[in-house]
């Protein structure tokens, strides 16, 4: 099925690309998410009329993500406290939601889905490097300092 991308889609293309995808992927994901429309003659003409608007919107989203990445880089590290044993292992774990809440408390708008924990939740005290995926092209690293209560 031919679709026109309205947003950048990883491993597929950028705004305005006409790509061929499986019909289920288009009907169940791309079209309902607003990331693509079917490539009919009317939609192609409509898209060409809106191309500048969509590209400007995509550029604005990218610049906002870069600004948030700069704020995260400026902050450098956040602290999260949790109960821990004498050996430094936590009673429980620090999840992506806890890290996102710490970043929000520091003044940076981040959702838990943007926090990427490579090896799962943090289970020990100390400093851990965590990736924050803000945009398809923008990632930021933040140091999470887990301290025992």
Curated annotation (Swiss-Prot):
Protein family per UniProt: Belongs to the bacterial ribosomal protein bL9 family.
Disulfide feature: none
Domain of life of the organism encoding this protein: Bacteria
PANTHER family given in the database record: 50S RIBOSOMAL PROTEIN L9
Gene Ontology BP annotations: translation
Free-text function comment from the UniProt entry: Binds to the 23S rRNA.
Alphabetized UniProt keyword annotations: Ribonucleoprotein, Ribosomal protein, RNA-binding, rRNA-binding
Protein name from the UniProt record: Large ribosomal subunit protein bL9
GO-annotated molecular function: rRNA binding; structural constituent of ribosome
GO cellular component, one term: ribonucleoprotein complex
């Amino acid at each position: 099925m031919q679709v026109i991308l309205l947003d950048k889609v990883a491993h597929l293309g950028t705004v305005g690309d006409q790509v061929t995808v499986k019909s289920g992927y288009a009907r169940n994901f791309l079209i309902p998410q607003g990331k693509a429309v079917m490539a009919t003659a009317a939609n192609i003409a409509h898209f060409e009329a809106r191309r500048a608007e969509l590209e400007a919107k995509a550029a604005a989203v990218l610049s906002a993500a870069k600004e948030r990445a700069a704020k995260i880089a400026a902050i450098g590290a956040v602290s999260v406290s949790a109960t821990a044993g004498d050996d430094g292992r936590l009673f429980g774990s620090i999840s992506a939601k806890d890290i996102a809440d710490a970043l929000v408390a520091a003044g940076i708008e981040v959702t838990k889905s943007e926090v990427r924990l490579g090896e799962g939740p943090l289970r020990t005290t100390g400093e851990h490097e965590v990736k924050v995926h803000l945009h398809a092209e923008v990632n930021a690293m933040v140091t999470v300092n887990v301290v025992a209560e």
